[in-house]
């Protein structure tokens, strides 16, 4: 009677598959293959800046208007892909020079940079599925290991295992810590 009240059950032991799991920690990062630095095609003066950090942009939308130093004609600097403006180094009236004026990141997929200790290196392979959980356990999703670093960090004595994660709702924000 006490066993039933405690919710304890009895079952017959038999053959089953054992799955080894590994607990890792990491951070969300933009998918570097979906990040673009945007510079002026021709040197000139920024006449207007149309976007700020955090703005969503579609491919081809205006980021700024520049007056060319050579032709004195204005041209529009456009977003090379749809995403979010993550950096801006442009203000109206400034010379463009050769610097990057904007960074645009498509966050529909993100990378999870997991810290992998050398003793665990043999347990992680490209192609494996990884369950990613937010630190507060509010979010959970499965991704695939797409890269395991062939070299480690002297500062942390770890290697990077990279998981690609679909992020259609933009709920996995770069910079946040996660568990895997």
Protein language model regions, located:
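N-terminal beta-strand block that forms a small beta-sandwich/beta-barrel module immediately after a flexible targeting
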Residues: 1-40, 89, 142, 146
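Hydrophobic core residues within well-ordered beta-strands of beta-rich domains
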Residues: 22, 139-141, 157, 178
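Low-complexity, intrinsically disordered
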Residues: 126-142, 170-171
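Short, solvent-exposed secondary-structure boundary/capping segments
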Residues: 35-37, 95, 151-162
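Short, acidic/hydrophobic/Gly-rich beta-strand patch recurrent on exposed beta strands
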Residues: 38-39, 65-68, 103-105, 162-164
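A structural micro-motif recognizing beta-strand termini
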Residues: 41, 80, 116-120, 163-169
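Surface-exposed patches in structured soluble domains
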Residues: 27, 45-66, 78-115, 135, ...
């Amino acid at each position: 009677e006490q066993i039933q009240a405690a919710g304890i059950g009895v079952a017959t032991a038999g053959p089953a598959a054992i799955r080894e799991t590994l607990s890792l920690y990491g951070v969300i990062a933009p998918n570097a293959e979906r990040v673009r630095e945007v510079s002026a095609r021709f040197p000139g003066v920024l006449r207007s800046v149309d976007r700020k950090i955090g703005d969503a942009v579609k491919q081809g939308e205006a980021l700024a208007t520049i007056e060319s130093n050579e032709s004195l004609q204005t041209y529009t600097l456009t977003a090379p892909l749809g995403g979010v403006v993550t950096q801006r180094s442009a203000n109206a009236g400034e010379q463009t020079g050769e610097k990057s004026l904007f960074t645009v990141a498509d966050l529909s997929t993100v990378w999870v940079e997991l810290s992998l200790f050398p003793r665990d290196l043999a347990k992680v392979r490209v192609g494996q599925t990884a369950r990613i959980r937010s630190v507060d356990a509010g979010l959970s999703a499965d991704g695939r290991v797409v890269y395991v670093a062939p070299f480690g960090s002297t500062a942390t004595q770890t290697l990077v295992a990279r998981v690609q994660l679909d992020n259609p709702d933009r709920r996995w924000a770069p910079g946040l810590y996660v568990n895997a």
